[in-house]
Amino acid sequence: SFAFKVIACADKAVYLHDAVLSYRQDNENSSVNSSAKVFCVNAEYAEIERWIREDYARNHASDDVARMLKFNQVIKYDSYMWNYVRLAPEFYKEFLVQMTKEFQAALDAGDFSLDDLKPWKRANLAAILKDPEAWVDEHPHFATDGALGRAKYYASVGGPGVVAAFLVESLRG
């Protein structure tokens, strides 16, 4: 949440192509294998949302706050799917059930709409929102399928247009 807050408050920023932080997933005590750390990313995004609604809102117009809440949901989707892919399989259902609660609440509050997401992300989130536990059962290898496997999945939930958009984005790197 610190990085989000800094960027949200910055007048200017410089972006580097090189990664300066790497996540280790190679030991049995890493967060991917710890039930106590499954929801760390959720806690970070809860803090970001609290900060936007309480602190950021004090000094910014309501339109800016609404834009920031929408942006938060869009990047939260990416972070949550990254987290899902890195988790041990026994945590998939529990994580997606919580993810569904959070995104449904944001949709109900009008913080964002599915149309704010890219087509394949929209199709995926809509499928998860329908029944997160069934989604895991129907797509047990989503986390390990790679780009081609995910393209096949996106075709099943969103059709060829979604696949084309996904492939174009994937090729851009």
Across the structure, where does each feature detected by a protein language model lie?
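Nucleotide-sugar-dependent glycosyltransferase catalytic core
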Residues: A3, C9-E47, N59, L87-F95
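Short glycine/serine- and small hydrophobic-enriched flexible loop segments
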Residues: A8, E47-R50, S79-N83
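Gram-positive cell-envelope targeting signals
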Residues: A10, S30-V32, Y45, E49, ...
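Short helix-capping and hinge/turn segments at secondary-structure transitions, especially at repeat
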Residues: Y15, R50-R58, W82
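Amphipathic alpha-helices of TPR/Sel1-like and other helical repeat/solenoid scaffolds
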Residues: E44-E54, M99-F103
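Flexible helix-coil transition and linker loops at the boundaries of alpha-helical arrays
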Residues: E54-L69
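Amphipathic alpha-helical repeat scaffolds of TPR domains
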Residues: M68-W82
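Membrane-interface aromatic/basic loop that binds lipid-linked glycans or pyrophosphate carriers
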Residues: V85-G173
